[in-house]
């Protein structure tokens, strides 16, 4: 029997053209592709027609598969000789639970390759005209998640003034609470802030305001998941650098 293996592939942020060369190579080798909600469906066409495709997407309040079931599927199919590609939006090791899946493989003795992807923590702001660092404006940035499995969130008040630019992934669900906590931790109420939804797709939208008014501005145009929050002086640069129209690919939902 041919030795199987697992390849954790970062799909990048929305646009299928932003996957890495190694990512496309891995898909071409696949016997099974286990893919997430935020990975562009167009990437599935890069796998052989004979390859099995299994949806394992997660979204607020529901999941197609439990994490334990995903881990077990990867290990089982690789042990049976398959090349299993685990396709994840962004980068698998940036709030993508890729580390858990890699550990499951390692503990089961299954070879596992990691193919990094372009993380939305940097790409979503960039695609909206916001650099996360900029000379003499922002020399540091931090990335946190706005959504956790058990409600044990990040202490944003403690982090508020520790970095120039703060990026919050999965930010839409608790946007008002996040902005309030950052203000409570010492960020200025009038500090520039932006939220970017569906980055890298034709449905990309962004709203720019301040920490004080961004929640209301976002609610007024029904910004929802998936969305990335950017807080810091660099957010104001979107007024000059944002593209006139989204440059990406439509993602069927």
Region locations from a protein language model:
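A contiguous loop/helix-start segment that scaffolds small-molecule binding in enzyme catalytic cores
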Residues: 3-8, 79-84, 97, 140, ...
